[in-house]
Structure formats: C-alpha cells, structure tokens
Amino acid sequence: MNADTLELARVGDPIALTRALVSTPSVNPQLEEGGSGEQETAALVAEWLDSWGLDTRITEISPNRFNVVGKLEGEGPTLLLNGHLDTVGVSGMTIPPFDAKIEGGRIWGRGSCDMKAGLAAILAATKRLTEEGPRPNLIVAMTADEEHASLGMYALADSSPSADLAIVTEPTRLAVMPAHKGFLWVRAVFMGRAAHGSRPDLGIDAIRHAALYVSALDDYGEQLTSRPAHPLLKHGSVHAGTIQGGSAASVYPDACEVVLERRTMPGERPEEVVQEFQRILDELSEREGDLSASLEQMLERPGTEVPEDSRLVQGLLKAGQEHGIPPAVEGMTAWVDAALLNEIGIPAVCYGPGDIAQAHSADEWVELAQIEKCADVLESFARDLVTQGA
C-alpha cells in the first residue's frame, strides 16, 4: 500500500479506502491456517474513524478477534451501518490476493467484493457526514468473524446498540435486499453391524441405509418447491453436505454419518424443520426393519425479512434513483449478519457494491463505479432520514 493511497483513504476517497483495506489482510483464522484475523484492519479503520471525529472503540470479542464501533452525533433517528472485517482464505487464488490492483474498471483481490468495497462505501459516506449538512445519529459497526461463526455480530447484538434501522453493505449489485434465507444443519447417524464382506447374512450396511435416506430427500426437495413461493426468495431447499462411513471395502460398515443442510424461509421454526427430517426417517424405518439411526440439530441461523414498504427499503430505492440507479428489490440467497440485527429489533437490509457471484472466487473483483455509487447512496439516504424522514 503506497503513501498516496493511504493519504487519499484518510480523506475519505472510496476507491483508495477499498484498496487500503484489500491491501491489509484479514483472513479469518478459523478458515485458513495462519489467517491474520481482523486486528490490523480493525486498527486501520479505527484510526480513520477517530481522525474524523467519531467516538471510536475497538473491542476484543475473542482472543485476537476485534470489532470496531464508531459513533457520531446527529439529529433524529439513529442509523447503523455495518460490515464485516474478515475474509475467507486465499488458497487457490489465481491473482495476487493483497495487491488491490486496478484494471478494467475493477479492483482485484481477496475481500474486494466480500466485503471491503462495502466497508469503504460506509467509511466514505461517514467522512462526508462529518462535514456540513444534516445527518442522523450514526453508528458505524465493523465486525469480526462473519465468514465463520458471526462472533462479532453476536457481540455487537449483546451490547444492545440503540439504532432505529440498519444497512449491511454486503455485495448486492446495488439492489436493495430486504430478505434472505436461513439455514439449519442436521447430523444423521446410521448404525449398522460390521461383518466380513462375504457374510451378508451377518452384516447390516449403514452406508446403504444412509443412501436410501439421502435419496428420499429428493421427494422432500420437490415438496418444498411445491409450497407457496416467497415473493423474493421463492422456496427452501435441502441437500446432503458431507458423508463419512465405512472402514474397508471388504467390511460391512457399522456406521455412516451424513450432515444435511436445509435452507429455510423467514418464519420457519427450526424444530418444525427437524420434525420434517424425522418424518422422512420414520417412513424409511417402516420399510427397512433393520434400520437404526438418529438425528441431531447442529447449527441454525434464521431467515429474515423487512417489509418492502418500510422507510428503509423505500428510502434506499429513492436515494438510489437520485444517483441514477434503477430501483431493484431482490432476495439474497446467502445468510448474512443482517438477520441477527433483525432478531434484536433493528430493521436491517443488505445494500452494497459487488456481486455475490464474485465473493470467495479465485479472482475476486469489484467494480469501481459501484463503490462510488454506493457511497453516494448511503450519504443521501442518511441525510434524507433527517430532511425527509426517508
């Protein structure tokens, strides 16, 4: 990162901010051995926010994992702007991950799309809001660990931030995304009986039973698509993510474990989803008398949505149109931290530069124009909250 880029970043240039952030590694250490974590990036962000006059705090939410929160007084409602500091790993990348090269109207590098461009848009808008003109009360919260377990957002939520509405600048191609699916993981363990491969009369094949169960999920998936469609998210889905079983080709396997993922819709209850998995298992058990299996719920994250007619959604659409962005409201397929803000009563939507298709890719990039437009829209939306009630 050269001195000119740093100087431009300090005065709030969105492109320079993006390049400075991409040039500062923040690989989640839970996802790649030797990952640097968020400490250096958090310190850089905190330095900028503090120099712009925000009341800024760095919090260690877990050993060597850091959140940054800056607050700026204004008038009227309180707007929370959020993004995550961490990135996925760099293994397998086909470009230098931290060069932040500009070429073809794009910035290239790990985290450029997911989501350091979004952080830069927040920072650029924040710098402008510190200057003349109306502004709401502002909370800038940049969190750790979204790519793994959302430790940073859970810590932020536990601190009970007092905000009226929130924007999470995940990559949405500058479409407003007020809804996204949740997910639930279930571990299915099938127990068989080990025996020599030449003795089918003695063995019970746990892998066969697991395969029958996974095959039965095809019908379950079709049932999900036959349910009434969500206007933005359409339908839930189900698939098997991992499978482990057996000890040798010549031995009937006595155990097989399958981890299943169900993508859920806003409002679906996890216990009801687990019951659906159990129903399928019970039906299979009736046909296969020697089947023995158990289900265990693992990780669950809720789906979420904000009404399309809310001031948050409509205000962002209006601010976008002021800057020549055609209005677009879409659903987000991935799960993001916005759901946890909605859970604590802060309406949150996703709106940011970049395309989720580029996130985590081997040659990750983001368009320069989208970064600049996003900063413009965030500033306009924030000011409109005060002058027009957005």
Functional labels for PLM-detected ranges:
Residues 25, 49, 170, 210, ...:
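Residue-level signal for inorganic ion chemistry
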Residues 2-110, 131-134, 355:
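Acidic/His- and Gly-rich active-site-bordering loop/insert found
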Residues 115-185, 386, 390:
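Acidic/histidine-rich catalytic neighborhood of metal-dependent amide-processing enzymes
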Residues 2, 178, 187-390:
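Metal-dependent amide/peptide-bond hydrolase catalytic core
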Residues 89-103, 178-189, 315-318:
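Acidic-glycine-rich active-site phosphate/pyrophosphate-binding loop
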Residues 81, 101-147, 187-190, 201-221, ...:
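Alpha-helical metal-binding/catalytic segments enriched in His/Glu/Asp
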